[in-house]
Amino acid sequence: MAKTKGLPKDTAVTPSPHLRPHTADLNRLLAGEHHDPHSILGAHEYDDHTVIRAYRPHATEVAAVVGGERHVFTHLEAGVFAVTLPFTGLIDYRLEVGYDHGGDQPHIHHTADAYRFLPTLGEMDLHLFSEGRHERLWEVLGAHPRTFETPDGVVEGVSFAVWAPNANGVQLIGDFNHWDGNEAQLRVLGSTGVWELFWPDFPVDGLYKFRIHGADGVVSERADPMAFATEVPPQTASRVTTSSYTWNDDAWMTQRAAQNPVFEPMSTLEVHLMSWRPGLSYVELADQLTEYIVEHGFTHVEMLPVAEHPFGGSWGYQVTSYYAPTSRLGTPDEFRYLVDRLHQAGIGVIVDWVPAHFPKDAWALGRFDGTALYEHADPRRGEQLDWGTYVFDFGRAEVRNFLVANALYWLQEFHVDGLRVDAVASMLYLDYSRPEGGWTPNIYGGRENLEAVQFLQEMNATVHKASPGIVTIAEESTSWPGVTRPTNLGGLGFSMKWNMGWMNDTLAFISRDPIHRSYHHHEMTFSMLYAFSENYVLPISHDEVVHGKGTLWGRMLGDDHRKAAGVRQLLAYQWAHPGKQLLFQGQEFGQRAEWSEERGVDWYQLDENSYSGGILRMISDMNGIYTSHRALWSHDTSPEGYSWIDANDSTNNVLSFLRYGDDGSVLACVFNFSGSEHSQYRLGLPHAGTWREVLNTDAADYNGAGIGNYGAVQATDEPWHGRPASAVMVLPPLSALWFEPVAAEAPVVQEPPTAPPLS
């Protein structure tokens, strides 16, 4: 702002007959409902002269400075000003806008005219978006700082673009205009429904919203669907931001592109960033979370949704700003720093992604332009009754584009290594959690959501092509076929899916008294009937430690010693079973209390001599064993990697099997689910020789009883369990033992797997 002193001299010209716009145009402009305000405002040539118009409702005076001469505008009506220039071919000019702030003279704001600039979106961008094929949509929609070279100097500002095809008008509001959008009205670009405006001098870090004049007659103030940053909730404005981050994870990204995660180790700790250690920022998490993950040997961290969400109690699963990391913990570049630090430490980063539904907040996506825009118009398809949310219209090209580009955005802009897609089952079935008569069938009369299937296939095919080496994981709780089958073979194209059947059966079994487990032995063997039908992740997730379900510790019966033994055994079983393992924060040391997003993990339990400390030490050791033994992960998805030793010893409550690696290695895993020690248990093995005890969950180091086999067993040529050799061993109660052959004594010969049990 500046005083009027020293302004260029005023120039008077006979007013043009075109000075005042047509009444209909003027009325639409004043109502905030003009589709092309640029056709009225800015500079326009008429025969031998030029008219410049400006809409500045709070100004007391407006002038245009052209070549050092000051041309004072006439106030026409309600803040609309205009001036006539006695020539054509205007090259450039600046506006001087005076505001009365109570002083002797008005304060003058010098600026370029927003309505002088051409659209910042190209025809190809608009075409690709309307076709649903703009893979870098975030580069054209949303808020983008720009710099233009003009004859009168450099102009800096921000371009804004938003999709609202049924809106009667769109205005930009923010701190820059005291949240009054009359002077900053966007234009619609052709028939695309995209509204656009470049606003000079808009500051980076400035707050903004769009005022949408909806087709339903309702005027609402909306956050930008493509916002890259936001205010800290519960505030809801979007924030202009740019990235200046320099990545330091080239080695990781190169390695990622060369690998297929399906055939690599994956031991994942699932983390809710806000409650892992409450109060930490992204920058602080970069130190503390990275150190913790590395110390305890996990290969990946999976973050509950990071995208901005207004309600903390949703844990991030009701997203309002899909392109903005939550501002609760810092800036987007600070989130990049967190990912970068994890990568530099050799840790993969997976984020939960929620394309199934979104909340109904009046300032967000719902009925965005006064119509069902992002959501399906038919409430029988467009609303998720259980969650009180809207369901995306997966059949609309622009909506699919918004979501597919969003998946790419997280993978490419933030270098995340994978997306865990939430609530896939709710997307696949039109009758999901709906009463009879409360859903509509597809074109073939079925309940499959064909549009959602097409979207998931498109998303998976696109992200895997654009970002080789990333992983997509489906939370899919039904038996939908081909979830991890490639899209060119008719599958959905996910890399992996959560094995909810394994999780439910296993947690049901370990919750039983060991005395009764013999009668439920099938719960622990059934998963092997389908273990290789998909590429599985074995989840013990946040969903299993909330809402009265208890914790792993709480599910175990008996005193603390038995509870700890049961937790250790369960985790060793999870790590040994085919599939990648995922464990929610706190369960890696047997947290006793259920999780709540309102408080942190119960770190106080980690006394060095506590049962929790023992469980965590075992996790650290077990992760080291896991990553160094290819038998535990290289054949996770094929029968070649697994063979039962004995699946049917329900009398003793013992399960045993072999895991094979693609390098010919073998690991024998045996589990005693009874509460009694078996002191003379004979186990069939592939060959004679020394078999080293790689893991004993009852070890004293883990605060177990220390019962075991002194580190090894000797296998002889006595056949047992259909194997040519066997060893007699001690099985502690509620324990898991892993054995590997001593390589110098006996080379391992890979054998074909046996059939899964039928009983």
Swiss-Prot record:
Catalytically driven reaction(s): Transfers a segment of a (1->4)-alpha-D-glucan chain to a primary hydroxy group in a similar glucan chain
Keyword set includes Cell division: no
Listed EC numbers: 2.4.1.18
GO CC terms, sorted: cytosol
Residues in the signal sequence: none
Active site: D422, E475
SMART domains in alphabetical order: Aamy (SM00642)
Keyword Acetylation: no
CDD domains associated with the record: AmyAc_Glg_BE (cd11322), E_set_GBE_prok_N (cd02855)
Pfam family, one: CBM_48
Protein's pathway: Glycan biosynthesis; glycogen biosynthesis
Gene Ontology MF term list: 1,4-alpha-glucan branching enzyme activity; cation binding; hydrolase activity, hydrolyzing O-glycosyl compounds
Any single GO BP term: glycogen biosynthetic process
Positions of region (Disordered): 1-22
UniProtKB keywords: Carbohydrate metabolism, Glycogen biosynthesis, Glycogen metabolism, Glycosyltransferase, Transferase
Subunit and interaction comment: Monomer.
Function recorded in the entry: Catalyzes the formation of the alpha-1,6-glucosidic linkages in glycogen by scission of a 1,4-alpha-linked oligosaccharide from growing alpha-1,4-glucan chains and the subsequent attachment of the oligosaccharide to the alpha-1,6 position.
Family the entry assigns: Belongs to the glycosyl hydrolase 13 family. GlgB subfamily.
Protein name: 1,4-alpha-glucan branching enzyme GlgB
Annotated gene: glgB
